[in-house]
Amino acid sequence: MEQNMFIRILNSEMELATGCTEPGAVALTAAEAGQALRKAGVDKAEEIAVNASINIIKNAMSAGIPGTDYEGMDYAAAIGALGGDPVYLLEVMNHVPRETVEAAAALVKAGKVKVNVAQVPQKLYIEVIAKGGGHTGRAIVRDLHTNVVLVEQDGTATLDKQDADTAASGDSDVVTPEQIASFLTVRSIWDYCTKELDPMHDPIDIIRSAVQVNSVISDEGLSKEYGLAIGRNLDLNCRKGLMTRDLTTNSMIAAAAGADARMAGAPVSVVANSGSGNQGITATMPVVAAARWLDIDEPTMLRAVTLSNLIAIRIKSKFGRLSNLCGATVAGTGAACGITYLLGGGYHEICCAIQNMVGNVTGMVCDGAKADCALKISTCVNAACQAAAMGTRGVRVQSTDGIVEENVERTLDNFAILSTHGTSDSVILDLMLNKDHTPDAQ
């Protein structure tokens, strides 16, 4: 039963997506509204209103739209409403014809798509209202990127799950953050990945997909100048002798290149982690690159990638789907654990790596999804490799320092508190003054 729960969590929290997941979620919501409009006999929307939470707007406003030169949630909404099929979920924009994309762009340029801040308690909230021919389609996504809770046609609900909790309103295979937080611990993840998991026979297809699919977008990011071309330039620096090509730089290159391509809107899929493609790339590609550098066998690599992604999921379950802190710090912490395992570290050593990551990169701010996400990712991967190298020697940030506690679970809880309650000095001081010095069980 427990092993099945690990698989359920992986399948619930890891999924295929194209482009940034926030514009993808906007396009999905708009596709539901547009479909409702078409069922009323209207071929296409004439005007669109998007009401979204601050976090959604922050993450969607500068992200590239896959396969186009456009960026932002207004274009995502228009594309979704005019030609999106909700069945494709976060890949909805991948299946829209070019002529429909251009019609959507014309609608945006004509000022017919409005984006407003929704005054709601949820960090992840999207409402799209599409109008045309005297009819109205309306849809709402809430809490999770694909959790459609309301669809209306001319004011009549064809789907209404607003009063249901997240688990009940979504797919039956969805595991809620609360369920994940109560089930996953660093110890249980370690024991599962190193003692129970049979990576060559257990149904971890999503992990294999993450390795394969995210490797493709990483290679794509190296093939041309996407965005700031962080991965490509790191690779060039190695070729010029300005940097040493080693495990750390290869891991940085692999992750940053994938984010370069994704943020620029390359029409290439990723396997996301906890609703974020960049987090999926960051939790997967540094570990894959390290395994290739160390010439590690496939079963061990798959264990390490699973470990990394589950650690990221565990942190994110309390961190919040969307946050004021950068998700690369979360996924980078997972990567640090995966790399520590590849370097021969045990449970104590991965705990040290986690403490080192929290002591180092905590506080990196999320200021939206955009090209320089790749720069932040490269920084977090560099920190992950350093944390792993220190951790394998048993070196860790001490519980006298900052928000790091003696117990790794409490350190991660402190990390989550900063994400959910802000990063003010008063919050930080409160965490520093109220520590539990109970050591980890060995």
Locate the predicted segments by residue.
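Acidic-glycine-rich active-site phosphate/pyrophosphate-binding loop
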Residues: M1-R8, D43-I56, D246-G265, D297-I315, ...
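A structural signal for small-residue-enriched, beta-sheet-centric alpha/beta enzyme cores
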Residues: Q3, A17-T21, I54-I56, V141-N147, ...
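Glycine/charged-rich beta-loop-alpha catalytic/anionic-binding loops adjacent to active sites
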Residues: F6-E15, N55-A63, A261-A272, A312-L322, ...
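Conserved phosphate/anionic-ligand binding catalytic regions in large, soluble enzymes, centered on
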Residues: L16-E32, V268-M285, C326-V330
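Early transmembrane hairpin of solute transport permeases
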Residues: A27-A130
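Hydrophobic alpha-helical bundle architecture
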Residues: G34, A40, A290-R303, L307, ...
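Flexible, glycine/charged-enriched surface loops at secondary-structure junctions
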Residues: A40-E47, Y88-M93, V115-N116, H201-R208, ...
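Signature of multi-pass transmembrane helix bundles
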Residues: K109-G265, L429-Q442
